[in-house]
Swiss-Prot record:
Active site residues according to the UniProt entry: C622, H895
InterPro entries in the cross-refs: Papain-like_cys_pep_sf, Peptidase_C19_UCH, Ub_carboxyl-term_hydrolase, USP_CS, USP_dom
Deletion phenotype: RNAi-mediated knockdown is pupal lethal. Pharate adults removed from their pupal cases display severe defects in head eversion, with head structures forming within the thoracic area. Pupal lethality can be rescued by supplementing their diet with CaCl2. RNAi-mediated knockdown in the fat body results in the activation of the Imd and Toll signaling pathways under unchallenged conditions, with constitutive expression of the Toll (Drs, IM1) and Imd (DptA, Def, Atta) antimicrobial peptides. Flies infected with E.coli display enhanced expression of Atta and DptA compared to controls.
Disordered: annotated segments: 1-53, 91-117, 130-254, 273-297, 360-410, 500-610
Gene: Usp2
Protein name: Ubiquitin carboxyl-terminal hydrolase Usp2
Domain USP: 613-938
Functional summary from the UniProt entry: Hydrolase that deubiquitinates polyubiquitinated target proteins. Required for preventing the activation of the Toll signaling cascades under unchallenged conditions. Essential for bodily calcium homeostasis.
Bias type Polar residues, positions: 392-410
Secretion signal, residue range per the UniProt entry: none
Lineage: Eukaryota, Metazoa, Ecdysozoa, Arthropoda, Hexapoda
Length: 938
């Protein structure tokens, strides 16, 4: 009977089921063999019971999984390293008690070897096939107590491996010889199929005896495992009980068995097996006939973990330290042998991890001034002299060096902190590594400044940090790069640059903050912070005094990405030193004349800390977080959104996007809010733009265009239907004005007023000299990069407006010649927008590579002059840089961060998802990672 398999999958033709028929050989008495081709005879010979016909689908899958051509070494490496194959055999009942030995810690070792030759063979390195399977070529003989076991492995010309095992005992009068089944691969290249004991992975013992499944016998535990490489893999499970032997003892039987696949045992089953071992030790050992009837049901679905990962440490937590790895062996306290390394992640562990993440996320809503006392897992860092600060940091293990975004188990579960995903095999929630080095692998929490009385200062200007997790270390807060000198954390005088004519001097004031502990501590701590602001910021000093006891901040969620020590986690609920030291400045000196939306009547409100809010990465959403941070620091847009109040139940999808974006901006610019999750905004945006419904990496500039278009559509109050009629005899400027007026009547919104400019396109025929001029709106300028490795932004703009020749297929139709002619085309800017967005075209359309040219762009106020690129070259148009979207990585994958200038403090900060850095210098803005530049017209 042939099995019908889909030919489109490229499967090999399934041979007849008769290839797996069983044969029976006897030495003295010939046992009765099974009459069916798919039946497996019992070891008892003629008196053995017949198992019955094997499932044909299972047999087909068994043969398919042995096809070597489908063994792709990169298939599901992170989640499913390999599927275990167990040989279903039956063992002749012996009169001796099998020797027990713990083989839980033996990886890639033959479990048949005992103490006599185990040290030599365990340390011997075996050659492996291309898929990691072992190919033994030797014959070994090993003595195990009273039992002599001899294993013979031979290779046949057609790639079939045969195992012949002969066992003799001192007391038994009969001899039983078993020939293990032939596993014939369905290939044509005569390649030997993978055999037992895959190198570097854990072998699971398959003891087909009458004893309980949780007892390891010293008999022959030959196994065979295959690495599954197809996306439609399914575990072949068998719940049929093993065949029992007959009472005859003097019969020597050789039988053929079949491989099947079985999932790895999860921790829940391990706990169950431990309880069974304890019960068996307390109770008398039952007879073999009774123990053979008990079989623990295997789970149908498990998550398989790699034996090469650091999951052993997490498994010790599951088992309460019962299993502890020492030099390749497993020490089990007063316990018999058990399969301790057969572990995985069960659904309860995942559920517990997610619940823990939800609990930690819920804590961010608490008042930062009211925190619990310092627990055993927290640490408080004290300030060092000279203005340098020492902070307590959570060690960022190598498990996070593979990138930002892993799954919830890896990110938020404290029980799974040591999981290491294999390099290059990332999940859908994994980003590319970001600035991962051996010395820059920890994330600093906000500093804790110690007052003269010994207690850390708390409150609005408080500086108390709590480090959560495993080991803590002291690091020095550094500047924009960790290899530079530490920044002296003195008080900073913020100069108001709203007016060009004068600057506002800061006046020394005193800020008082009160922090209240949780009801559990029943104490109130009042702290006074005094900051003196002299005329020069470089000579400024800070005097601190405090009274009362210390208060702690809430727990800190682990960062999404590996970051250097200069980052301060905004999740801690404490203020940054540059903010806390300058908190004594009068609120009137913090007001920006051109931004009434950032003003406040309350002097206790810390305006400089508003907006310094990180955005959590919910799965490869760094491109969205980077763009949102840049738009959040667009002052007029943020001022409008902070006062915008709409309803969630709006008619259009664009209005829903606007509503969620306004809610997000309002929360980001709320005092004492340091991290926000943009889940609702992404959900609303993905409803309209389905390409963003998944969690794949996307282009930030493309997302910016879609996002601004949705905001414009939600606010658009223009009237449609009017046609544009312009006389060709009018001047270019008059044509431009009429075209712009017509466009604004159709597209009327605040977003258009802020970001849209007008581009003049000139087309000139090289034959007749006829010139055609058109005016089109633009949302951003995508400028090409020159071939030099280092250039200026002006060179990119020159390439953008440079005259281009249209020839060949690009030739347009000349209105005067009435045919296609070779023409020249050039651009100039007719109308400049309020906010100019410049996109550096780093991703080549012809090459699948990223251009890493360093573009030197103006960073100071009013430094960029765009007048020479306008249609009217005699005008001066000045712009000031206020935000940058950086991309690190390549076209295959990377990471986005944002560099933004705070509208109040006028300081630069880096927003790396939920991590916000300290104030940066303008010298650190120019890099080869700059991708989108945001300029404000001054």
């Amino acid at each position: 009977m042939m099995l019908d398999i889909k030919k489109t999958r490229g499967f090999h033709k399934i041979p007849q089921a008769s290839k797996l028929q069983s044969t029976t050989k006897t030495s003295s008495v010939v046992a009765t063999s099974a009459s069916s081709q798919n039946e497996v005879p019992s070891p008892g010979g003629s008196a053995g019971s017949k198992v019955g016909a094997t499932n044909p689908v299972r047999a087909a899958n068994q043969r398919f999984f042995l096809v070597s051509s489908y063994k792709d070494p990169t298939f599901l490496k992170a989640e499913c390293d390999l599927a275990h194959a167990h040989v279903t055999t039956s063992k002749v009942k012996t009169t001796l008690q099998p020797h027990r030995r713990s083989r839980a810690g033996e990886d890639s070792r033959n479990n048949n070897y005992n103490t006599s030759r185990a040290p030599t063979l365990i340390n011997m390195r075996r050659p492996s096939l291309f898929n990691g399977n072992q190919q033994p070529t030797t014959t070994n003989s090993t003595t195990i107590n009273n039992t002599t076991s001899r294993n013979t492995t031979s290779n046949t010309s057609n790639g079939v491996l045969k195992y012949s095992v002969r066992s003799t005992t001192a007391t038994a009068t009969s001899t039983s010889t078993r020939n293990y089944g032939k596993l014939k691969p369905l290939n044509n290249n005569q390649t030997t199929a993978g055999v037992a004991m895959m190198n570097g992975h854990t072998n699971n013992n398959n003891n087909n005896t009458r004893n309980s499944s949780n007892i390891n016998n010293g008999g022959n535990n030959n196994m065979q495992r295959q690495q599954q490489q197809h996306d439609d893999i399914s575990f072949i499970d068998s719940d049929d009980p093993p065949a029992t032997g007959g009472p005859e003892a003097g019969i020597s039987t050789t039988k053929t068995s079949i491989c099947y696949f079985k999932p790895i045992t999860p921790p829940l089953q391990l706990r169950h097996e431990q309880n069974q071992v304890q019960q068996q030790e307390e109770q008398p050992q039952p007879s073999s006939s009774k123990s053979a009837s008990h079989r623990y049901p295997r789970p149908k679905s498990t998550i398989i973990a790699s034996a090469h990962s650091n999951f052993a440490a997490s498994f010790e937590k599951f088992s309460g330290g019962l299993y502890r790895q020492t030099n390749g062996e497993t020490n089990i306290e007063s316990k018999t042998s058990s399969n301790a390394r057969r572990y995985g992640i069960d659904s309860l562990s995942i559920k517990a991890s997610i619940e823990k993440f939800n609990n930690l996320s819920g804590q961010k809503r608490q008042n930062p001034g009211s925190g619990s006392g310092i627990g055993p897992g927290s640490a408080t860092a004290s300030g060092l002299g000279g203005g340098r600060l020492s902070v307590a940091s959570r060690s960022n293990h190598g498990s996070q060096a593979g990138g930002s975004s892993s799954n919830l188990q890896q990110r938020y579960s404290s029980d799974l902190d040591n999981i290491r995903v294999a390099a290059g095999y990332s999940s859908s929630l994994t980003r590319a590594a970001y600035r991962t080095t051996a010395t820059m692998n920890s994330v600093s929490t906000p500093v804790a400044v110690t007052s003269e009385l010994g207690g850390p200062i708390s409150g609005d200007g408080g500086e108390t940090a709590t480090a959560m997790g495993q080991p803590t270390s002291k690091v020095t807060v550094r500047g924009a790069h960790s290899n530079r000198q530490p920044i002296e954390c003195d008080s900073v005088v913020l100069t108001n640059k709203a007016s060009k004519d004068a600057t506002t001097a800061a006046t020394p004031t005193v800020a008082t903050a009160t922090a209240t502990h949780t009801p559990a501590t029943s104490s109130v701590s009042t702290v006074t912070v005094t900051a003196a602001a002299p005329n020069s910021a470089s000579d400024s000093t800070l005097a601190r005094s405090g009274t009362g006891s210390s208060s702690t901040a809430r727990s800190v969620l682990p960062p999404m990405t590996p970051t250097s020590s200069r980052y301060w986690d905004r999740d801690s609920g404490t203020s940054r030193s540059s903010i806390g030291t300058s908190s004594a400045l009068n609120s009137s000196s913090l007001k920006h004349n051109s931004d009434d939306g950032y003003k406040t009547a309350s002097s206790s409100r810390d305006e400089k800390s508003e907006g310094l809010c990180g955005l959590r990465n919910i799965g490869n959403t760094c491109f969205m977080n980077s763009v949102i941070q840049c738009l959040s620091h667009t002052q007029e847009l943020t001022r409008f959104l902070r006062s915008h109040h709409g309803s969630r139940s709006l008619s259009t999808k664009d209005q829903q996007i606007l509503h969620e974006f306004a809610k997000l901006i309002q929360e980001m610019w709320t005092a004492n809010v340091h991290t926000v999750t943009p889940m609702e905004l992404k959900r609303a945006f993905s409803t309209k733009h389905r390409m963003y419904s998944d969690y794949n990496q996307q282009d930030a500039q493309e997302f910016l265009r879609f996002f601004l278009d949705s905001l414009h559509s939600a606010l658009n109050s223009g009237v449609k239907g009017e046609t544009l009629n312009i006389d060709d005899n009018l001047s270019d400027n008059k044509k431009a004005d009429l075209t712009w007026e017509w466009y604004t009547r159709h597209e009327n919104s605040l977003v258009r007023d802020l970001f849209v400019g007008q581009l003049k396109s000139t087309l000139k025929c090289t034959t007749c000299g006829n010139t055609s001029v058109t005016f089109d709106p633009f949302w951003d300028l995508s400028v090409p990069l020159p071939s030099s490795s280092r250039c200026k932004l002006e060179a990119c703009l020159d390439l953008f407006i440079r005259e281009e020749v249209l020839d060949g297929d690009e030739m347009p139709t000349c209105a005067k010649c009435k045919t296609r002619r070779k023409c020249t085309k050039s651009f100039t800017i007719q109308r400049f927008p309020k906010y100019l967005v410049i996109h550096l075209k780093r991703f080549s359309e012809t090459r699948w590579s990223k251009l890493s040219n360093i573009v030197e762009f103006p960073t100071s106020d009013s430094e960029l002059n765009m007048g020479s690129y306008g249609a009217n070259s005699n005008s001066n148009v000045h712009y000031s840089l206020y935000a940058i979207s950086n991309h690190m990585g390549s076209t295959a994958g990377g990471h986005y961060v944002a560099l933004c200038k705070h509208p109040v403090s006028r300081k630069w900060h880096e927003f790396n998802d939920n991590i916000v850095s300290d104030a940066l210098s303008e010298n650190h803005l120019v890099s080869s990672s700059a991708y989108i530049l945001f300029y404000e017209r001054t």
